[in-house]
Amino acid sequence: MDVAKQFSSYLKQENKTENTVQGYTSGIRQYIKWFEGSYDRKLTKLYRQNILEYISYLKNVKMLNAKSINHKISSLAKFNEFLIQKGSQQDQVILKTDMIKVQTVYASPTQIVELDVKKFLQSVLEDNNKRNYAIATLLAYTGVRISEALSIKMNDFNLQTGECIIRSGKGGKQRIVLLNSKVLSAIKDYLIDRKTYSTAHESPYLFISKKREKLDRTVVNRIFKSYSNVITPHQLRHFFCTNAIEKGFSIHEVANQAGHSNIHTTLLYTNPNQLQLKNKMELL
């Protein structure tokens, strides 16, 4: 087993989310590719000088933004911890000061409006795929993350009470989200279709495919792209937060539904987005 796969197994043993495992493992594979391409040798441990050179490469050659670089540094820090536990390394060579300081952006991350979402949902509806419509409606009107939606099991939701348990929330936290009539109707329609899937009897998951017992997020991203170049699963989450606040939800109500551990994250949705800020600048 190569070291990246070993690292992936290590993360899973720590009960990291599927998203975190994929993101960190991808970051390490990229570093290994850069290291072996630069020095023509196999990676056995991390060296401080190499880390500094890699960060410089990400900044000046790849021209990545601070957020992307910081994510790769976080991956390397976790990988460093893994190598120490494995006995391949003794020292921690990634420091907290390696992280690039970023000024907090106070603009709302929402880039789409209600009309955009309605048009998108109508396109999915007219395509007559009940599963895809149920997923899109769930994301737009509950604010759950795509990873959370795809981890919902058949015994996690109650169509009578309109409640769903999110067991795989960020940081391993559980919460109950409320399902409105639009979501309930879409799920009920899909459940009839779900019975025709060959994997329906074996799979405990709500969202399945014809071949797999659990729908993959890359498949969902591809489905969304076939309908829109702008609307993504994550944009629907942003839309929910902004839409809920505009419809009268309190900050704490939105935070509970969306699973925000920090209330300041929710507060961002009370602010204008980048385009609105630019338009305001033109008024000066």
Swiss-Prot record:
It comes from the Bacteria. Pfam families: Phage_int_SAM_1, Phage_integrase. Transmembrane segments: none annotated. Keywords: DNA integration, DNA recombination, DNA-binding, Plasmid, Transposable element. GO terms for molecular function: DNA binding. GO terms for biological process: DNA integration; DNA recombination. PROSITE patterns: CB (PS51900), TYR_RECOMBINASE (PS51898). Residues 107-282 form the Tyr recombinase domain. The active site is at 145, 170, 234, 237, 260, 269 (o-(3'-phospho-dna)-tyrosine intermediate). Residues 1-84 form the Core-binding (CB) domain. SUPFAM superfamilies: DNA breaking-rejoining enzymes. Belongs to the 'phage' integrase family. Resolvase catalyzes the resolution (a site-specific recombination) of the cointegrated replicon to yield the final transposition products. This is TnP I resolvase.
